[in-house]
Amino acid sequence: MSGATLEAYLASCTTHGDELSRDVAAVIQRLAKAALDIRKLVNQGALGTVFNGMHSGSNTDGDVQKDLDILCDDQFLSCLQGAPVACYASEELENPVLLDPAARLAVAIDPLDGSSNIDNNISIGTIFSVLPAAKGPDVDPSQSFLQPGNRQLAAGFFVYGPQTALVLSLGRGTEIFIFSSRLGCFVDAYKSVGIPDRANEFAINMSNYRHWEEAIRLYVDDCLAGSEGPRERDFNMRWIASLVAEAYRILVRGGIFLYPADSRKGYSHGRIRLVYEANPIAFIVENAGGSATTSVDRILDLVPESLHQRVPLVFGSRREVARITRYHVDPNMIGERAPLFGKRGLFRA
């Protein structure tokens, strides 16, 4: 339904008599409305009263919260009041919030991903996951979020950039909607997005090279060696330091994103939050024909141990993601490389 409004698209995906799909559609429409309000705040830039303000507290990761982080979290929580949502979990909150115990859905969200980039006018966004709510007498709301990502009913992210976009998957493909100021709504601009299997771009923060494990170094060395190395073709490197912006680019034109675990304190288990960042991104990417792993294991098969658990994240073009896994698990991938591209690599550790 390319060119359809978000409302029309959701209506087309709602099966007659299927109350669960109607509930999912209702939640997505509420999130979209809240995102448009946040878009207005972000577009004010430094002119906005909450743009640069620092909150006195910190989030679950220990990061100092900006006032805009808190405002966005409040905005999304408020928009889901009265929606068919049993509980709400957020990066900004230590524990889930119970909304309607009788409702069927649970929503996990990163209200303002990339907020450290706000001052630099780089695209930021909101990432969300819609899950079936855990049921049972006296059930702990956190149980709704301790289920593998392959149980997600929907996932998406908003990008607040030159265009305001919604990337959405209901489990049957991935669509990209762009907000039309003329129509006042989101319009389907990229129908059934497909990530190419073959990639010529990779995104990673090269400043951490010395901290990576050998398999990641070797993969990057081979990409940098280009047509003169074992890959026998040239690669470009990208790094925006905004997960939603990186994911959007890969969905539109292919490539691979790597945020591996490394040897720094606090990074040995990765840095991307599984429940409300890695899982929704992986769901979106897989429904666009790509792959998402921890470098070895499929993201969507992981069972979260805690709400704010962190993991390494590699996603994008299927062949490249599979190659990185082979670098980790198949010693022959190292032995078969040309001597110049052996363990030493192009950079000294």
From Swiss-Prot:
One of its GO terms (biological process) is fructose 1,6-bisphosphate metabolic process. Its EC number is 3.1.3.11. Signal peptide: none annotated. Binds 2 magnesium ions per subunit. Substrate binds at residues 113-116, 205. Keywords: Carbohydrate metabolism, Cytoplasm, Hydrolase, Magnesium, Metal-binding, Plasmid. It is found in: Cytoplasm. Its cofactor is Mg(2+). Its main location: cytoplasm. It catalyses: beta-D-fructose 1,6-bisphosphate + H2O = beta-D-fructose 6-phosphate + phosphate. This is Fructose-1,6-bisphosphatase class 1.
